[in-house]
A protein has these predicted regions:
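N-terminal leader segment of winged-helix/HTH proteins
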Residues: 1-33
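C-terminal regulatory/oligomerization modules of transcriptional regulators
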Residues: 1, 125-159
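Short, hydrophobic-biased segments on the C-terminal half of alpha helices
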Residues: 53, 71-72
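Charged, amphipathic alpha-helical coiled-coil/dimerization segments
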Residues: 72-130
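Short amphipathic alpha-helical segments with heptad-repeat character
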Residues: 6-9, 13, 17, 61, ...
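N-terminal helix-turn-helix DNA-binding core of bacterial DNA-binding proteins
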Residues: 22-65
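A structural signal for well-ordered alpha-helices, especially hydrophobic packing surfaces
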Residues: 16, 50, 104, 139-143
Length: 159
């Protein structure tokens, strides 16, 4: 299990980098040059919602990128709209602009193409469900380790 555990960690990291490269290629093929792959993933995670930068940070993994910086760049390039909360002036909420919604649709079509290709026998739906379940357990384990400290050993997985 030692080798498998370390291999999974390395695989998750490689998959994330490869997927970001796929997003970059998609942006290039669409002629979109004013947003990078990480920003496009942040944009995709916003979708049709409105949220704070803090909420956005919790929703996705952006390889240690500065989400606030990326939000600022997307604002400058017209992909998002930023509004102060009427209840708490310190809180800023973001949502996609029309330009952002257009790119979101392009990203959604990319995901749909990928799913169609995968369904041709590359990966079965049950395989994705099983991988998702296992990765969620790892996520809960690592979250527990962070919350309890690096030496935390007692962990009871949720079903």
């Amino acid at each position: 299990m030692d080798a498998a555990y370390l291999d999974v960690i390395a695989l998750v990291e490689r998959l994330h980098r490869q997927f970001l490269e796929v997003v970059k290629l998609e942006l290039d093929s669409q002629g979109v040059h004013d947003i990078n792959n990480v920003q496009a993933m942040i944009l995709f995670n916003i979708g049709d919602l409105e949220m704070t930068v803090g909420e956005l940070t919790l929703r996705g993994c952006y390889l240690g990128s500065n989400v606030s910086y990326n939000v600022k760049k997307m604002l400058e390039n017209g992909y998002i709209v930023q509004e102060r909360s009427s209840h708490d002036r310190r809180s800023v909420r973001v949502r996609l602009s029309d330009k952002g919604l257009e790119l979101h649709q392009k990203m959604k079509r990319m995901h749909e193409r990928h799913l169609a290709s995968l369904s041709q026998g590359v990966v079965q739906a049950d395989d994705l469900v099983s991988a998702h379940r296992t990765l969620r357990r790892l996520e809960r384990f690592w979250t527990h380790a962070v919350e309890m400290g690096a030496r935390a050993t007692a962990f009871t997985p949720a079903a």
